[in-house]
């Protein structure tokens, strides 16, 4: 059954336009609350609500609070807190659910709502569909004796800071390291600097002055140029860039080189494999560079590919019983440390790995160079693009065997097929990408 409101990461959109309106968000809170009450009729459920630093967070927080309490659910409010912080506190406080008001790496004009289930895990499909079904029912406020209560909780940030620090090995310290930390003017602005400072690092802070409008604005994991310049200017050892809600990580070394999620996952996996502590293998996505897969195989580390989206990486990790995975975008999962992707915790795992291996980022990542990728977006007229591309696709896969691969991905929002070819030779990637694209264009003419 397809979802009507939920995407791969909750409900998201431009503020003031459906579904990110106070009216709909209140009803969303009510629907989710009714589902929680139906699942736990012996006691009154409690949910945790956190948000990033967008100006619209105040409005949407109030709407959610109204919806949940109308359904008879108690609400705890944390104020600004990273998405993984809400996941952690949902588990630590043994709550029925956690809710985050954030649009992650998007600009301030957007916002979204995503849920964590009991235990700090993302909602499964069945629960999302229950909430969607409840959204189609009329909203009926509980009698006054059955309304929920709401209050702000103290110490949420401090508890999460201590949790982050606990994932860094006790025998190690960040003393002697100079770090530039870019918090994207987002939810980690009052968290990440304290974590690194309390572990001993000398800090330079950027993107730590949110005003409601500057989240992800030329700062953060999606705009590493600012971090590169700051690392070079301050002669720092490393730069750490997080995104607006704190679940992505990009790093920069002392020479100003940028390291994406794939490279950082490789660093973590290599260090764990060297110590015999890597459980199973590594999960990436269909877009993970093949060169990384081959490098892991040389280390004897199995590699699996999930669909694009950290939700699907997480599902495959659980299915295989593995712990490490993620995406080039900087979503990194270390399931022995946290139930969800966490930029701060991932950066601590990278820094610990470097200390344990006694190598630099550049030295470890020299194990592999990303294969060149050619991406062509092909617009079609609704034709059978799979049939049209079958012959050149088969030829390409035969020609690239062991040297590259082809990924064809239809857009979910427009009549476009994304043709991606990667190979150890740029000309080879270009040739086959153009051949497949031309075959689709021919039947669409």
Swiss-Prot record:
The catalysed reaction is: alpha-D-glucosamine 1-phosphate = D-glucosamine 6-phosphate
Its required cofactor(s), as named, are: Mg(2+)
Instruction: Identify the EC number(s).
Output: 5.4.2.10
Top-tier EC class: isomerase
Please, which domain of life does this record's source organism belong to?
A: Bacteria
GO MF term list: magnesium ion binding; phosphoglucosamine mutase activity; phosphomannomutase activity
Q: Where does Mg(2+) bind?
A: 104, 243, 245, 247
Query: Could you tell me which residues carry Phosphoserine?
Result: 104
Please indicate if the UniProt record lists ATP-binding as a keyword. no
Functional note: Catalyzes the conversion of glucosamine-6-phosphate to glucosamine-1-phosphate.
Q: Which family does it belong to?
A: Belongs to the phosphohexose mutase family.
Under what name is this protein listed?
Answer: Phosphoglucosamine mutase
Q: Origin organism of this chain?
A: Chromobacterium violaceum (strain ATCC 12472 / DSM 30191 / JCM 1249 / CCUG 213 / NBRC 12614 / NCIMB 9131 / NCTC 9757 / MK)
